[in-house]
Amino acid sequence: FHLLRSFLPGMKAKREGWIFPVLSMAAREAFPGWSGYCASKWALDGMITALRAELAGSGLRITSLFPGATDTAIWDDLPGSWNRGAMVPAREIARAVGFALDGDPASLVEEIKIGPAGGAL
């Protein structure tokens, strides 16, 4: 939110730029025990979806990223036992973002939802 407030005016003035908010599968799915986290992600998704509509035709682009459990160091400090081998490799997230960036300027990948092949962990 604060980054958008800081950078959006300049991006609008230049009529160019790409915003890649990293949300979470928790913005679209309810996870028991994570209600506060889910609520914050649902709210952010709503704000970004509205902003995408507001910016249509402005030259600015927004591609929302909804990663599921991704194998990164963040899991090192979380309590519990996590099957890191079943998580999405971080390089796959990068490949998905690259796909969106390399697309034809006449099209827009609005959302990327990528999660573990076996479902939510």
Cite the ranges covered by each PLM segment.
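C-terminal helical subdomain
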Residues: 57-60, 64-65, 80-121
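Active-site helix of classical SDR
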Residues: 4, 40
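Residue(s) in the substrate-gating loop at a strand-loop-helix junction
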Residues: 24
